[in-house]
């Protein structure tokens, strides 16, 4: 079973995370590298599904849907337009991953979002 798990960012944590890891606008990093740092750092670990913790990314795709730096890296690597929105990226990720289940922690979206 393929699961797309999405959670929203907590601004102060992302700022502290980037400071702790020396991430700036000039940092050269890929989506996979930044994503792995987030997972290793324990971001939202109490909410993440166990396969994400075990790095079984072929079964679970976990992302922080409104963490701009992360999502824009994914968008660039997947050929999305530079002016795409976080929602555009989110939908593209679901279409790309083709999950059986969408597990979303952002209460602002209703099921008809997808």
Tell me the role of every PLM-derived stretch.
Residues 19-38, 45-52:
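Short amphipathic alpha-helix
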Residues 58:
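Short phosphate-binding/catalytic loops that engage adenosine nucleotides
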Residues 8-11, 39-55, 64-114:
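Extended catalytic core of nucleotide-activated donor transferases of GT-like folds
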Residues 1-25, 61-72:
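Short, solvent-exposed beta-strand-terminating loops
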